[in-house]
Amino acid sequence: MRATRFKETYGPYALVAGGSDGLGAAFAEAIAQRGLNLVLLARQEDRLNATAARLRDTYEIDVIALTADMADYETVKQRVGDLKLSIGLLVYDAAYAPIGRFEDVSEDHLAQAAAVNVRAPLLLTKLLSAPMIERGRGGIVLMSSLAGSQGSPNIAAYAATKAFNAILAEGLWKELKPRGIDVIACMAGAILTPGYQQAESSKPAPGTLEAKDVAEQTLNALGNGPIVIPGAVNKIGRFALMRLLSRRAAIAIMSKNTRGLS
């Protein structure tokens, strides 16, 4: 979709949750390149303001930075509502991933994962889709993960929340398409973000992508179907896990990949 058409369909404002750095910032930049104004939500105020200033100066667009914790949805809802803007595109990239054996993960960490990864995207989608339906146009991007394709030991709760995001997007894709709303879930594999690079002591895993490539492939796929899997290696991997192997075998493979997480 050309930039002009993208802006007409999803503008004038896009909201990116988790837009201060990493993949969220890559989404924000890709959207800015298409001419939309931005509302960026994130917890890290310094990083958020720096990203907002850079995009504002580079692309000469309006960029509003809102410091917010997505676990506190009521505050997020109030602050977004107070803007009284026409938001035609939602990109939900905020996430919280408790890592380790389930028995060792605290209730507070599990509740945080549910709040950030499930409750907030669900309710923010509800909030922003209503005016999109009234206008007869809009777009919603929910970040899922290849980890959500099957059970994933040591990140069991996180993987389950990512499965929720994918299933929600699939249902809304069919439900909202006749209303002019495009919905898609991005089922990404490993992404070269600051967090990933800090966690990985060795070279990146096969299929690891740059954040900008994930953002571009996802936005280019918006309107074409309910799921996008960036990267050829990741597409092949998911096909094998979902179509060629039993669920038991798929979980066993994922268990090997997540064995070192703690």
Language model feature labels by segment:
Residues 103, 152-156:
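Active-site loop immediately N-terminal to the catalytic Tyr-X3-Lys motif
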Residues 185, 201-239:
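C-terminal helical subdomain
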Residues 13, 18-21:
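Conserved glycine-rich cofactor-binding loop
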Residues 145:
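Residue(s) in the substrate-gating loop at a strand-loop-helix junction
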